[in-house]
Design a protein with these regions (language model features):
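Short, low-complexity disordered leader/linker segments with a strong preference
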Residues: 1-29
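An alpha-beta-alpha
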Residues: 52, 145-172
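Periplasmic-binding protein-like
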Residues: 87-95, 113-117
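Hydrophobic alpha-helical
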Residues: 93-109
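Short, charged beta->alpha transition segments
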Residues: 102, 122-127, 144-152
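Flexible loop/hinge segments that line or gate small-molecule binding clefts
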Residues: 107-139
Length: 172
């Protein structure tokens, strides 16, 4: 997990440097938008926000988190609009709930960099994905950990296995 967030921080440094011009006093804002949780959820959103916060503080870059009022695609896109209107040059979006909103946002804001965590932008739930030139998607390999867990259980002598997932998602 530390390597993952170190990668996010490195990516932020790269994005920050790509927007620099000589002689300018521009300040760059990194926006992190929660999906349905908060930045104190002791999970995905909190980990992402802590990475953004640490990077911002170490590099003297302004940062802010946004919590959408509505978690449907229109509400998430509206929150992305708010972040960009407030000066965000890099927008971090953890969680698959953003897939449709990010599909639109990456085209709407070609000068803004987007970091997606655990999804690729998807057109209206159609399955058609597109990662724009201004977007980087970090994906987890959930199937690998599931395979290893199942293999370990069988090696221990268990032959009747079951699984209960929290949501109907491809990874689950």
């Amino acid at each position: 997990m530390k390597k993952f967030f170190a990668s996010i921080l490195c990516l932020g440094m790269i994005f920050g440097a790509t927007g620099c011009t000589s002689g300018g006093d521009d300040t760059y804002e990194i926006a992190m938008i929660t999906d349905s949780g908060s930045v104190t959820d002791k999970s995905f959103n909190q980990s992402a926000y802590e990475g953004v916060k640490e990077f911002g503080e170490k590099n003297d870059i302004t940062y802010k988190y946004y919590a959408p009022k509505d978690t449907d695609q229109a509400g998430l896109l509206s929150t992305i609009d708010d972040a960009v209107d407030n000066g965000a040059k890099v927008v971090v979006t953890p969680g698959f709930n953003f897939s449709g909103a990010l599909y639109q946002a990456q085209e709407k804001y070609p000068d803004v960099k987007f970091v997606t965590i655990d999804f690729e932008p998807q057109k209206d739930g159609s399955g058609e994905t597109k990662v724009g030139d201004n977007t980087v998607s970090y994906l987890f390999s959930e199937q690998e950990s599931g395979y290893v867990a199942g293999y370990a259980a069988v090696k221990e002598g268990y032959t009747k296995l079951g699984f209960m997932g929290g949501m109907a998602l491809p990874a689950v």
